[in-house]
Amino acid sequence: VHEEEKPLIPIPEKILSYYKNYVNDMFLEDGVSYETQKEFEIGYDEASDRITVPIRDDLGNLVGVKGRYFYREVPSDIQKFIYLEKCARSQILYGLYKTINYIKQNRRVFVVEAEKGVQQLWSAGYCESVATGGKKITQCQIDKLTRLCVPIIFVFDKDVEQKELEAIADKFIVEVEIYALIDKDNILSEKQSP
């Protein structure tokens, strides 16, 4: 079964009790305040030595947990990200359950690739964002973004080329306003986003 066809199944909240409720300095150095880390329930899994990022659906139900290797330098034999609790990521706009009211209030949505991007924007006072979980965007995510009925601003990593963003924009119906922030002056490093 294709991932988009799998139902999003809520998992028990008690799963989060397996992880330590710790904030971390790496996210802080990357622009995610301790307060924001607590808001998004960032934690730590001792068993896998990973920072934990709970994944919630549009209604706030826990549907997965993503783990990021705890150290900035990742050895070649270790995956940087794994799902400690798997979910149908292609059906998720990370953060939407928390940011929907800000999206409606500010009449726009910033779309980033990674969950941490939503947290960085939140820390900077831009609470109207969601993450796709990567540069590939699914029809399910396109439909959810379209239903927000607000202008959509893509703020993807610098390594995503303008033609890739144009191809994404072409997947939306013509009535949807699509914008993208692109670093044409080479201010950012490859994995940074505007």
What are the language-model segments listed below?
Residues 46-149, 164:
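Phosphate-handling DNA/RNA-contact segment within nucleic-acid enzymes
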Residues 129-136, 179-187:
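A short glycine-rich beta-strand->turn/loop micro-motif centered on a GG-aromatic cluster
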Residues 143-148, 188-194:
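Short, surface-exposed amphipathic charged segments that create phosphate/polyanion-binding patches used
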Residues 135-180:
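Conserved catalytic cores of soluble enzyme domains
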Residues 159-160, 186-188:
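Conserved nucleotide-binding/hydrolysis micro-motifs of P-loop NTPases
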Residues 1-52, 56-59, 100-103:
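TOPRIM metal-binding catalytic domain and adjacent DNA-binding surface shared by DnaG-type primases
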